[in-house]
A protein has these predicted regions:
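Polybasic, glycine- and aromatic-enriched phosphate-binding surface used to engage nucleic acids
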Residues: 1-159, 163-183
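Polyanionic (Asp/Glu-rich) segments that form extended negatively charged tracts
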Residues: 188-190
Length: 190
């Protein structure tokens, strides 16, 4: 993957990861989609209907390829947010929050995946649509006393979720099934 739009364009590559939401999954994962972003999205940006009207209008392209927090804006249950590493694009159903520091990104990821925020979102967002408006209204209380602990626990959660995600053959970083590590099915999952 690329670390910036310029790097993506200079690479000459065609396909890049894209956040499009997905099923309930906290901390990491739902990395399922690729998008044709060759030549800075030339084909997508020029895509027109039969009347010549533009059908696609990518937004906020300066934020493409940055790390952030992504989530599925439509959910029938609890909101789940995930770490999105550098190198991904995003679209409307796979929104992304961006931060000026990785420390704040990780801290806020811990906050938004908490039970407290879930209860708050029941008031701010009583429907199944967790779009940017209600998410942007979430109050962020920064506890400097607890920040190191929260960041450490969130990193552990991301790593555990990434290991789980990568144990499936559909993961781009798949190496080996968990079943291979155990002598039988019970041993593989205990």
């Amino acid at each position: 993957t690329a670390q910036s739009r310029q790097e993506a364009q200079e690479s000459g590559k065609k396909w890049f990861p894209c956040n499009k939401g997905g099923s309930f999954r906290k901390w990491y994962g739902n990395n399922d989609f690729l998008v044709n972003w060759k030549n800075d999205g030339e084909e997508i940006r020029a895509f027109k209907d039969e009347n010549g009207k533009l059908r696609s209008r990518p937004q906020n392209m300066d934020f493409y390829f940055r790390e952030g927090i992504t989530w599925s804006t439509l959910s029938i249950g609890q909101l789940s947010m995930r770490f999105s590493p550098k190198g991904h694009l995003f679209e409307t159903k796979g929104s992304v929050l961006f931060f000026n520091s990785e420390e704040m990104l990780i801290y806020v990821l811990g906050l938004v995946n908490s039970v407290v925020i879930y209860e708050l979102l029941q008031v701010l967002c009583p429907t199944v649509d967790f779009h940017e408006g209600p998410i942007g209204k979430i109050p962020v209380l920064i506890s400097h006393d607890d920040m190191d602990l929260v960041i450490r626990v969130v990193h552990q959660n991301i790593e555990a979720s990434k290991q789980d995600w990568d144990s499936y053959e559909t993961s781009w970083d798949f190496k080996q099934s968990l079943l291979v590590n155990g002598k039988n099915l019970t041993a593989a999952y205990t």
